[in-house]
């Protein structure tokens, strides 16, 4: 299995390969598509070490990463994602239990990422834009913004986080991480729409005006990933001269 992440800026373009060794063991490998992306891939080793120390306080393990040349080799983890676990609870109508489980992980994010007051840095502005944020937000020095239910693996005796590629070594408000957890679970599957009446954003302390800012941050982040590259889904708008009405 190979997944290409090539609709990106050249310095971020990679592919992910899952392969099986002679002994049947599966491994995951992230490889730069361009020489410019080698530093991005090699950085995963440093990120793994940093997150391992951070997540230890909440008894969360990090998918182990080993750098070989310009490639990152990661263990292939088995288990069920938190996203799938939440979906099973939803299908069984156990929405109270779903909410309790989901918010236990939201609390873990807050415990890990609320160590000091947030202040904007030039690095933050470069990725997320010079957005107008509340003054009471908290953060840490390192921010894995992709700590979403699909990237959390639950097994019999441990909880692990995978796919931590979008970890930044500068402060990002913890509330933005919580926003992404909720957004990427609630908004990307119609069957989860019934949960919107449970007001997850409000219960997490996220106000409508906060959401407006976080939508802008997410847009700026996606533009940072693209760089000068134009994604196929956006290409028509750029090359089409527009519609002409013919009578």
Stretch-by-stretch model annotation:
Residues 169-178, 185-247:
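Helical subdomain adjoining the active site within ATP-dependent kinase catalytic cores
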Residues 11-53, 84-86:
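ATP-binding glycine-rich loop module of kinase domains
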Residues 126-192:
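Catalytic activation segment of kinase domains across protein kinase-like and atypical kinase folds
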Residues 15-21, 61-66, 152:
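Short, exposed beta-strand/loop patches in secreted or surface proteins that constitute
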Residues 1-5:
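Juxta-kinase regulatory segment immediately upstream of eukaryotic protein kinase catalytic domains
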Residues 62-129:
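Conserved structural core of kinase catalytic domains
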Residues 109-138, 191-204:
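Short glycine-rich, low-complexity/disordered patches
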């Amino acid at each position: 299995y190979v997944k290409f992440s090539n609709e990106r800026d050249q310095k971020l373009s990679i592919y992910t390969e899952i392969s099986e060794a002679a002994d049947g063991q599966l491994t995951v490998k992230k490889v730069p598509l361009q020489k410019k992306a080698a530093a991005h891939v090699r950085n995963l080793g440093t990120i793994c070490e940093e997150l391992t120390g951070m997540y230890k306080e909440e008894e969360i393990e990090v998918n182990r990463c080993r750098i070989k040349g310009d490639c990152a080799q990661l263990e292939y983890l088995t288990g069920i994602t938190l996203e799938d676990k939440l979906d099973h609870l939803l299908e069984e109508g156990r929405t109270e239990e779903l909410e309790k489980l989901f918010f236990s992980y939201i609390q873990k994010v807050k415990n890990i990422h609320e160590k000091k007051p947030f202040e904007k840095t030039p690095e933050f502005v470069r990725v997320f834009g010079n957005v107008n944020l509340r003054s009471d937000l908290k953060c840490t020095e390192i921010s894995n913004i992709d700590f979403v239910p699909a990237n959390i693996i639950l097994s019999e005796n441990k909880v692990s986080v995978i796919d931590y590629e979008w970890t930044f070594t500068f402060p990002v408000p913890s509330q933005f991480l919580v926003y992404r957890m909720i957004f990427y679970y609630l908004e990307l599957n119609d069957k989860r729409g019934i949960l919107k009446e449970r007001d997850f954003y409000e219960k997490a302390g996220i106000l409508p005006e906060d959401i407006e800012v976080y939508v802008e941050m997410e847009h700026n982040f996606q533009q940072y990933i693209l760089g000068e590259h134009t994604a196929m889904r956006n290409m028509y708008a750029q090359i089409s001269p527009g519609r002409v009405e013919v009578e």
